Swiss-Prot record:
Protein name: Large ribosomal subunit protein uL16
Entry keyword Ribosomal protein: yes
Assembly and binders: Part of the 50S ribosomal subunit. Weakly binds 5S rRNA. Probably binds the A and P site tRNAs.
Purpose of the protein: This is 1 of 5 proteins that mediate the attachment of the 5S rRNA onto the large ribosomal subunit, stabilizing the orientation of adjacent RNA domains. Modeling places the A and P site tRNAs in close proximity to this protein.
Originating organism: Haloarcula marismortui (strain ATCC 43049 / DSM 3752 / JCM 8966 / VKM B-1809)
Biological process terms in GO annotation: translation
Length: 177
């Protein structure tokens, strides 16, 4: 069965449901890694720091976080090479557990379905709660690679729901000159 539309889980309208020690059957996170690029190099070694900042308070499902991470990282690998001199971090982790009260449809569904009886729902996935103004991705790079990082972030925010902006946190004076 396919996933429900992200609009069902986008708004933060329920209390946090994150206590994994009490919840069984949580599917694994689709996010393969949170740190990409040259992991052994320190972030302070790079002159430019660029972040993707979310402008709305939303929940982002782990599938969309992985899709945006993959899109950005693939672009950077393609442009800067497999051993490219950059470091990128996904800053959010999907702690929020999502539930869904499945409904039967079609002929005879009224006899099979329980309706709203025992409507707590089954676990279907996880999501990250992101507040407005928080950083979703941060990349550290050299001055000549900054445009590639901005393009990678543009591709990343096309994969997620909220509007985002790309902000140069450090080294803006180097990019203007």
């Amino acid at each position: 069965m396919s996933d429900k539309p992200a609009s069902m889980y986008r708004d933060i309208d329920k209390p946090a449901y994150t206590r994994r020690e009490y919840i069984t059957g949580i599917p694994g996170s689709k996010i393969a890694q949170h740190k990409m690029g040259r992991k052994q190099k320190d972030a302070d070694d790079y002159p430019v720091q660029i972040s993707l900042i979310v402008e709305e308070t939303v929940q982002l499902r782990h599938g969309s976080l992985e899709a945006s991470r993959l899109s950005a990282n693939r672009h950077l690998i393609k442009e800067l090479g497999e051993e490219g001199d950059y470091k990128m971090t996904l800053r959010k982790f999907p702690h929020q557990v999502l539930r869904e009260n499945k409904q039967a449809t079609g002929a005879g569904a009224d006899r099979v379905s329980d309706g709203m009886r025992a409507a707590f729902g089954k676990i279907v996935g996880t999501a990250a709660r992101v507040q407005a103004g928080e950083q979703l991705f941060t990349a550290y790079c050299n001055v000549e690679d900054a445009e590639h990082v901005k393009e990678a972030f543009r591709r990343a925010y096309n994969k997620i729901t909220p509007s985002c902006r790309i902000k140069v946190e450090r080294g803006e004076e180097l990019l203007i000159a």
